[in-house]
Amino acid sequence: MASLLLLLCAAILYPLVQVLGVAVMEGGWPTARPLLAFFARPLFREALLNTLLAGVLAVAIGSLVAVPLALLTVRYRFPGRALVGALAALPLVIPPFVGAVAFQQVLGRSGTLNLLLLEHWGVTVPFMEGLTGVVLVQSLHYFPFILLNTAAALGGLDRSLEEAARNLGCSGFRLFRRVLLPLALPGYAAGALLTFIRVIDDLGTPLMLNYTKLLAPQAYVRVTTFGLTDVDGYVICVILVALSLGALWLAKAGLARGEFAVLGRNGEAPPMRLGRRGTVFAWLLVALLLGPALLPHLGIGLLSMSKVWSLTPLPTVYTAANYEEILVRSPQFIANTLRYALLAAIADVALGAVIAWLLLRGRVRGRQWLDTISTIPLAIPGVVIAVGYLRAWSGWRVPGLGDPLTSTWLVLVIVYTVRALPYAVRGAYAVLQQLAPALEEAAQNLGASRARTFVRITLPLMTRGLLAGGLLAFIASAVDLSSTILLVPRVELGPLSYGIYLYVQSAVGRGPGAALGVVAIVLAAAGTWAATALARRSGPARVRDSA
C-alpha cells in the first residue's frame, strides 16, 4: 500500500506540486505576484474569459442537441430508435482535433458549404472563424457525454411520477421542466461537468484552427516560446486546474441542495409508440440535431482520399497515395501509437486491479487517499500534466539508458498511463463491487493466502471488466494530443496524434493527415465497440453464475 501510494504521488502529485510551486513561490516564500501579473495582462484576461465562455457555450449548445435526443430515445418507440442511439455516440469516436480538420474542410471559409452558398446566393457564413469555430467543434464532439448521462438518468425514473403529473394537468414542456428535469438533474450535471472539463482541457482543436486566445493554447505557447523558466506558463496551468476543480465543486454543491431519489420503479411503463407522423417528425428532429455532428466523419473520409481539394465543394481528384504515405513511407506514427497505448493500457489494467481491490477488500489505512489520488487525473488538463513532467523529471536520467526521462518515449507511456488510470480503476471497481466476497472467503478458509486468492479467484472474475477498462485506456492514449504535443522528444518517436498535427500544418499534408485521422477513428471505434461488448457481458448475472 505504501509503495503504491508513493508511486502514485511521484507520477501524479509531484509534477502538479512542481507547477504550483513555480506559480505561487518566489525565493522560497509564497507570493501572489505571478497571479496578480496574470490578471494584469489583457491577453491573459481575454484567454480566461474565452475559456469560460467556450466551456459554458459548449455545454449550452450540447444540451440543446443532447436533451431532446435523450428524451426521444428513452420516452418514445419508433422504427430505427436503436440506430439513433448508435449514431449519437459516433462523434465520440473521432478525436476532436481530427474533427476540427474535417469541419474546416466542410464549413470553413473555403469549405464545401460556403462555396455552395457563395455560388447560389453570393454570401458566406463564418462558421469556423475564431472562437465560434472552436465552440462549434467542441459542442458537436462532446454533446454525447450529456446525452448518455441524461438518457441513463431518464431511463431510471419511475414512470408513475410522470403519469401522476399528467393526471394533475401537467404536460408538455411544463412536465419536463417541473418533473423530469429535476429528477434527471444528477445525470445531466455529470455529463455537463465532463463536457466543461474536456472543453477547457482541449488543446488540439484550438491549435488546429489556429486560435490561441484560450488558456490551454496560451500555456502551450508560453512553454514552447519562452521555455520552462517562464512563470506565466505555470500560472496559466494553475488557473486551468482551478477552473476544473471549481466546476467540480459547483456541481457537487448544486446537487447537494436538492433531493433526487425515487422510491423504486414499480410504475414503469413502456416507451410511447409513435405513429407514422410522429416517426417522420422524430427522424426530422434526428436529422436536424445529428446531421451537423456527423459531418466530420464524411469530411475526413473524403479528404483522406483526395489528391486535389481546393476551392471546390468536393475533391476533384481522388487517390490512395495518402494511405500509402502513412502505411508505407511513414508507418512510425501508427506503430508508435500502438506500442505506447498498449503499454499504457497494460499498466493501467494492472494498477486498476490492485487499486480497486485495495479500495473494496483492503484493510489498510489511507484507502481514501488512494481513491482520491487515482481519480485526480480526470480533472487535470493534459497540458498541465505535460508541463509538470517537463519541470519535475527533465533532470532525472532513466537507469540503464542514461538519458533524461523527458528525452525518451517512456515519458509518453507514463503520462498516458497517468491520464487514463481513472478509467481502469473505475472499470475494475465496478466489476469487483458486483462480486460477492463469498468465494474469496471460502478460498481463504481453505488455507489460501490473500495474494493467492486475489490471483486465482478474484482476478479471473474481474477479467472482462478489466479488459473493458483497459480498452478505454487504450483509446484515450491513442488519441491524446494535449500532453503529447509538449512531450514528444523527436519526430520519429511521435504517435498518431502528433503525426496528424504535423501533417495538417501544410496544405500538401492535409491528405496524409486525414488518412491518419481515419486510422484514429477506426482505432477508437473498434475499441469502443469492444469495451461496450465486454461491459455488457460482465453484468451481475454473469457474476452470480460464477459465484
Regions found by a protein language model. Name each.
Residues 163, 171, 259-273, 309-322, ...:
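Juxtamembrane inter-helical linkers in multi-pass membrane proteins
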Residues 22-34, 108-120, 209-217, 258-266, ...:
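Peri-membrane helix termini and adjoining interfacial loops of integral membrane proteins
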Residues 1-28, 40-155, 181-203, 208, ...:
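Membrane-water interface segments at the C-terminal ends of transmembrane alpha-helices
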Residues 105, 203-227, 312-316, 481-510, ...:
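Glycine-rich helix-loop "coupling/hinge" segments at transmembrane-helix boundaries
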Residues 62, 168-170, 446-448:
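A short glycine-centered flexible hinge/capping loop motif at secondary-structure junctions
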Residues 250-285, 542-547:
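Alpha-helical transmembrane segments of integral membrane proteins
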Residues 165-166, 443:
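The alpha-helix within a helix-turn-helix
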Residues 157-160, 435-439:
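Short glycine/proline-centered loop/turn elements that form peptide/ligand docking sites
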